[in-house]
UniProtKB/Swiss-Prot annotation:
GO terms for molecular function: phosphatidylcholine binding; phosphatidylcholine transporter activity; phosphatidylinositol binding; phosphatidylinositol transfer activity. Belongs to the PtdIns transfer protein family. PI transfer class IIA subfamily. GO terms for cellular component: cytoplasm. CDD domains: SRPBCC_PITP. InterPro entries: PI_transfer (IPR001666), PI_transfer_N (IPR055261), START-like_dom_sf (IPR023393). This is Phosphatidylinositol transfer protein 4. Keywords: Lipid-binding, Transport. The keyword Nucleotide-binding does not apply. Catalyzes the transfer of PtdIns and phosphatidylcholine between membranes.
Length: 331
C-alpha cells in the first residue's frame, strides 16, 4: 500500500475554488466525451454524513477502450477496461473511491480531499494516526514550476504566461509565488492505493501515484487557473446549468450503451409461422411484459433506478429495475 498526501497551493479563495472546480470538472467531462472517451452517470443523489453535513453522491463508470492503445484494448478483457467511481462531495471535504471489476478486491484507490483558506500548511489536516503518518509521503504540486509532459503542454494553459483580465492575477513567474499570492488556499489530497498482486505491487502503485494521479492533479489545476476568466464571474445558477448539461451527456452515454447492449443480446429475428419479422436497431420488441408491440419510436429499455436507504458516507443502496422509455416516457 502506498499513501501520498498531495498539497496544492492556489491563488483562490476556498469559495472561488468550489465554483471553479465544478466548472473544470464539467468542462473536462465534455472534452473527454468529445475525444471519444465514455463516461456514464449511474446515480446522483443527496446524502448526509456522520457529522450531519449534507452533500452529493455520484456513481460513474469510465470506459477506457478508446483511451488505450489499440493492442492493449484488443488483448484486455472487457471488465479490465471499466473503472467505477463513487464520490461523496460535502465540500470542503470530499471522498472518492475507484474500483475495477477485473481486479476485484485486489485493487483499491481512495482519494480524500480537504480545502483550506490561507497559504500556511497543516501537517496533519486529515488527523492520521502515528502509524499512517510514518507511511505517508508528502508531495507538493506546483502548478507553475512543475514540468508537464511535452506532448501535453498547452501554451494557453501555462500559469507562467496567463494573466487574468478580470482579476489581475498571474502570471505566476516568481520562484516563491506560493508564499506571495493573495488570496491563497491549499488543496490537500490524501491518496491511498493498494494493488495486491505479488511481483507487481510496488511498480503499479508507484505508476498510479506518480504517472497517473500526480499528473492529473497538476494538469487539472493548471487548467483551472488558466480558465479563470471563463468561470470567475459565473453565478451558482450558471454553473449548475453547465453541470446539468454534463449530467445529460453522461446519461445519454448510459442510455446509448444500454441500448447497444440490449440490441446485441437480443434475437433480432423472430419466426411466426411461415413469416419472419426482422428488427433493426431502432425497431425492436419492448422488454416490458405488459407491452406486446414492436416499438420503433420510443425504444423502451430497462433502466436502473437506485434508492438510498441510509444517510452516511458508507451508505447502502437498494436497486430496483423498471422498464422506462428511451424518450423518458413510462411504458
Amino acid at each position: 500500500m502506498l499513501i501520498k498526501e498531495y498539497r496544492i497551493t492556489l491563488p483562490f479563495t476556498k469559495e472561488e475554488y468550489r465554483l471553479g472546480q465544478k466548472y473544470m470538472t464539467a468542462r473536462k467531462t465534455h472534452e473527454s466525451s468529445n475525444a471519444g472517451d465514455n463516461v456514464q452517470l449511474l446515480e446522483k443523489s443527496s446524502f448526509t454524513d456522520k457529522n450531519g453535513v449534507k452533500g452529493t453522491f455520484t456513481h460513474k463508470v469510465f470506459l477506457l477502450k478508446k483511451s488505450l492503445p489499440r493492442y492493449a484494448s484488443a488483448i484486455l478483457p472487457k471488465s479490465a477496461l471499466k473503472i467505477e467511481e463513487k464520490s461523496w462531495n460535502s465540500y470542503p471535504n470530499t471522498k472518492t473511491i475507484y474500483s475495477c471489476p477485473f481486479f476485484g478486491e485486489k485493487f483499491y484507490l481512495c482519494i480524500e480531499s480537504i480545502h483550506k483558506d490561507g497559504r500556511d500548511e497543516e501537517e496533519n489536516v486529515f488527523g492520521l494516526s502515528k502509524d499512517i503518518l510514518k507511511k505517508r509521503i508528502v508531495d507538493h504540486v506546483d502548478i507553475a514550476r512543475d514540468e508537464v509532459e511535452g506532448k501535453d503542454v498547452k501554451t494557453d494553459e501555462d500559469p507562467r504566461m496567463f494573466k487574468s483580465k478580470l482579476t489581475g492575477r498571474g502570471p505566476l513567474t516568481s520562484p516563491n509565488w506560493r508564499k506571495e499570492v493573495n488570496p491563497a488556499m491549499v488543496v490537500y489530497k490524501l491518496v491511498t492505493v493498494n494493488f495486491n498482486y505479488w511481483g507487481f505491487q510496488n511498480r503499479v502503485e508507484n505508476l498510479v501515484q506518480t504517472n497517473g494521479l500526480r499528473e492529473v492533479f497538476l494538469k487539472a489545476h493548471r487548467s483551472l487557473f488558466c480558465w479563470m476568466d471563463e468561470w470567475i464571474d459565473l453565478s451558482e445558477e450558471q454553473i449548475e446549468q453547465f453541470e446539468q448539461s454534463t449530467y445529460q451527456l453522461m446519461m445519454n452515454n448510459t442510455i446509448e450503451n444500454k441500448l447497444n447492449e440490449d440490441i446485441k443480446n437480443m434475437n433480432i429475428s423472430e419466426k411466426k409461422g411461415n413469416q419472419q419479422n426482422t428488427y433493426s436497431k431502432g425497431d425492436f420488441k419492448c422488454p416490458n411484459v405488459n407491452c406486446q408491440h414492436v416499438c420503433s419510436e420510443c425504444k423502451h429499455m430497462l433502466m436502473t433506478t437506485t434508492t438510498t436507504t441510509t444517510k452516511t458516507v458508507t451508505e447502502t443502496t437498494t436497486t430496483v429495475q423498471s422498464p422506462i422509455c428511451y424518450r423518458n416516457m413510462v411504458c
